[in-house]
From Swiss-Prot:
Name under which the protein is recorded: Probable cytosol aminopeptidase
Pfam families hit by this protein: Peptidase_M17, Peptidase_M17_N
Chief localisation class: cytoplasm
UniProt organism field: Xanthobacter autotrophicus (strain ATCC BAA-1158 / Py2)
UniProt-listed NCBIfam families: PRK00913.1-2 (NF002073), PRK00913.1-4 (NF002074), PRK00913.2-2 (NF002075), PRK00913.2-4 (NF002077)
Length: 498
């Protein structure tokens, strides 16, 4: 990954350097310190506002080049709209908007976090810094030539804040979360010829062990001994071995049940024998977005020393067609003992998840399980790329995820589950089949998974529309988004830390 920006914090009264970015609201008012900084440029700013008919609509901006009366090469004014109604996601967005307004030629910039009638506290300021990091990330590992006219050189950004010491402390936590998001993005962006299941497992072990996460890796032989034959069936057509990575962070009281996160990690999905169309198949390198999120989340929890016991499990396979590949019509026995008829080998994600869910439930007896998977195209049809689909057997967990999603900007929308959908996944020859037909595709996938959680509180997040290839946003210009790391980190922080 590439992060060409160095961030620092200084007191609000410090002298700005380079491009100057200030904030206003819907009334076009400035904070007290900003007014002092801009005093000599009042006339130039007023003329610019009038000339552009600038009204201060939320997230609108105006640029002034070398304004008279101000010792800055460029002044950028950003309106936050209603200053008293900003949520954490808004401060994150503010950082992204600010970073996006700095020309690639700039080497220094200052953001003055000062608003009229609303103090920007340490945690909010740290969110702004995180937004800058997320916006300026790029994945250019395989580019041998740089576009000098568009790619940024080194940039030093200073955030002027009301509480310098407090912001630096808050930024330490935010940086841990940011590191988790960017690690997840790196994993999703990697090509599948580089990031196969063994390599994914190796990177997870190397990266997470550095922050105190305990790692256990099950290879093909270990998976067979454990009884994960459904997961192994998905990968049997590939020359690459499958893996399950178990990540434990013990930050809570000894003996307290952990919270559990499970990720689908199909490092490349051809569809298997039920092969996908060629168009767009290259994007199937990202079919491990759920596993990337869980890995990034576990890193974030450990790096910020979260006071919780947490376990993350990821099932890593490659779904390929060859003479040994699983066939439509095959019947496999899952770790739970339930049998599954394979109707479509391209409905493989649920086959990976079902064994890992059962393993997590039986081995760890968790407080809850949340699985994440780029599971169905149907959820993209239903919700687009703005929301992830949420399916749950527990109203409290569902409500917490929904509220946290609104606060963080990683939003979820609850979808139905019910016994009336069971008949769509019942099989004539086995306990169930792995597809339920064209109708209610996301629901039947979740209904299938629900058979492997028993009474454990559980939520399934279908992130097919949010994990990769989403439209560029103020905080992400990358193909892989790292979606879910911030959501689940905040869920743990708000509700499950001691």
């Amino acid at each position: 990954m590439s992060e060409p920006v160095t961030l620092s914090f200084a007191r609000l009264t410090a002298a700005p350097k380079g491009v100057l970015i200030v904030l206003t609201d819907e009334t076009l008012a400035f904070g007290a310190q900003t007014q002092k900084l801009l005093k000599g440029a009042d006339a130039a700013i007023t003329r610019a506002f009038d000339a552009e008919r600038y009204k201060g609509k939320a997230w609108s901006t105006i640029d002034l080049l070398a304004p008279a009366g101000l010792d800055a090469p460029r002044l950028v004014v950003i309106s936050v709209g209603k200053a008293g109604e900003l949520k954490p996601a808004d401060f994150l967005k503010l950082g992204g908007v600010a970073a996006g307004k700095i020309p690639s030629s700039a080497r220094e910039a200052t953001v003055v976090l000062d608003l009229p009638g609303a103090k920007i506290g340490p945690e909010s300021a740290a969110e702004v810094a995180l937004g800058i990091r997320l916006r300026t990330y790029s994945f250019d590992r395989y580019k041998t030539k740089k576009k000098d006219d568009t790619e940024r050189g080194a940039l030093a950004m200073t955030l002027l804040v009301s509480d310098e010491a407090g912001t630096k402390r808050a930024a330490t936590t935010a940086d841990a979360v940011g590191d988790g998001v960017l690690f997840a993005r790196d994993l999703v962006n990697e090509p599948a010829n580089v990031l196969d299941p063994p390599e994914f497992a190796r990177r997870a072990e190397e990266h997470l062990s550095s922050v105190g996460v305990e790692i256990e890796v099950l290879d093909d032989a270990g998976l067979a001994r454990a009884g994960m034959h459904t997961l192994l069936g998905v990968g049997q057509g590939s020359i690459k071995e499958s893996r399950v990575v178990i990540m434990r962070w013990n930050g809570g009281p000894a003996g307290e049940p952990p919270v559990a996160f499970i990720g689908k990690g199909v490092t490349f999905d051809t569809g298997g024998i039920s092969i996908k169309p060629a168009a767009g198949m290259e994007d199937m390198k990202g079919d491990m977005g759920g596993a990337a999120c869980v890995t990034g989340l576990m890193y974030a929890l450990a790096a910020r020393k979260a006071k919780v016991n947490a376990v993350g499990l990821i099932g890593l396979v490659e779904n390929m067609p060859d003479g040994a590949a699983q066939r439509p019509g095959d019947i496999v026995t899952s770790l739970s003992g339930q049998t599954i008829e394979i109707i479509n080998t391209d409905a493989e994600g649920r086959l990976v998840l079902c064994d890992v869910l059962w393993y997590a439930k039986e081995q760890f007896k968790p407080k809850f399980m949340i699985d994440l998977a780029t599971l169905t195209g149907a959820i993209l049809v239903a919700l687009g790329s703005e929301y992830a689909g949420l399916f749950s057997n527990d109203d409290t967990l569902s409500e917490r995820l929904t509220k946290t999603g609104q606060e963080t900007g990683e939003r979820v929308w609850r979808m139905p589950l019910g016994p009336e959908y069971d008949k769509l996944v019942d099989s004539k020859f086995a306990d169930m089949k792995n597809t339920g037909g064209r109708h209610a595709g996301s629901i039947t996938a979740a209904q299938f998974l629900q058979r492997f959680v028993d009474k454990t509180p559980w939520a399934h997040l279908d992130i097919a529309g949010t994990a990769m290839s989403s439209p560029a946003s103020d905080i992400n210009k990358s193909w892989g988004s790292g979606w879910g790391v911030r959501l689940l980190n905040q869920l743990v922080k708000d509700h499950y830390e001691g």
